[in-house]
């Protein structure tokens, strides 16, 4: 199944390829997969700030993906605890806890079930500071949500709902691509003075493995990273899709096409300047994400780059995304934006 999705079943590694990008020392690191890196970040967050709390469905038992393993045993059930299956209640409680000056780290078991909490996130968390004239805020709220395809999840356990929240001023939306990024970005989200939705690519929980520093570190939000330099076309993505795009870049290189690959990391607010500079250099842009193409965040990136780089473009902006259908089960390989689809789009854009 993974091969059909254009993804390798082998353990993935994520070398730092960018020139001049912010690097995190791995001198004291050890190999971790993505869920272990997140678990380490949560241990650090609870250990360094006694006002921090972790809660959600089954988190006291370690969570369905084991991201909260050992937290309740170490920090006690007053700071790490289970909740009923009520997403709007979970987020609502987190908002109240954060409004009292605490760090509320909320887990939504699957991003597909975040929709019952939509009103709490959009009309309460995102507007808390604005509607009080900055007298009150719930900036200590971080919402963790596993998202995206996993090969067998179907339409209730595979969705990518990030675009819904990118239309909401007052919150931040962050998605990591690797274990090292996940730890540093999650700690930044927890300590950021604004509410954050942190989507975790669940396909990478066990597949992605790399050296992760054991110490406390943060990676800046709203700073994209050029993880592969090139001259012919710019590719922009986030999360697990970057591994697929990297494979397409390698195949394109064999055909003489030089691809520049950018990890957006933060979707709201996103780093327009890094993408703009790259597109002005290459003259071409391809965006890829798992979410359906219509109304996906790729459309926002496309519109912005057209406004900023119109006279520099050598070809129309290309989008390789999920199909405009409910997420299928047996037809998932046809729904997904695979390596071959991306490679075809790269070639057609470069040869436009």
From Swiss-Prot:
Superkingdom to which the source organism belongs: Eukaryota
Stored SUPFAM superfamilies: Thiamin diphosphate-binding fold (THDP-binding), TK C-terminal domain-like
Record field: catalytic activity: N(6)-[(R)-lipoyl]-L-lysyl-[protein] + 3-methyl-2-oxobutanoate + H(+) = N(6)-[(R)-S(8)-2-methylpropanoyldihydrolipoyl]-L-lysyl-[protein] + CO2
Binding residues for thiamine diphosphate: 113
GO molecular function: 3-methyl-2-oxobutanoate dehydrogenase (2-methylpropanoyl-transferring) activity; metal ion binding
Binding site for K(+): 139, 141-142, 189, 192, 194
The keyword Isomerase is annotated on this UniProt entry: no
Gene3D superfamilies, alphabetized: 3.40.50.920, 3.40.50.970
One GO term describing the cellular component: mitochondrial matrix
GO annotation (BP), single: branched-chain amino acid catabolic process
Keyword Zinc applies: no
Targeting presequence: 1-23
SMART domains with a match to the protein in the record: Transket_pyr
Annotated EC: 1.2.4.4
Cofactor(s) this protein requires: thiamine diphosphate
InterPro entries linked to this entry: THDP-binding, Transketo_C/PFOR_II, Transketolase-like_Pyr-bd, Transketolase_C
UniProt-listed CDD domains: TPP_PYR_E1-PDHc-beta_like
Subcellular location(s) per record: Mitochondrion matrix
Keyword annotations from UniProtKB, A to Z: Metal-binding, Mitochondrion, Oxidoreductase, Potassium, Transit peptide
Known partners and oligomeric status: Heterotetramer of alpha and beta chains.
Function field: The branched-chain alpha-keto dehydrogenase complex catalyzes the overall conversion of alpha-keto acids to acyl-CoA and CO(2). It contains multiple copies of three enzymatic components: branched-chain alpha-keto acid decarboxylase (E1), lipoamide acyltransferase (E2) and lipoamide dehydrogenase (E3).
Protein name according to UniProt: 2-oxoisovalerate dehydrogenase subunit beta 1, mitochondrial
Organism: Arabidopsis thaliana (Mouse-ear cress)
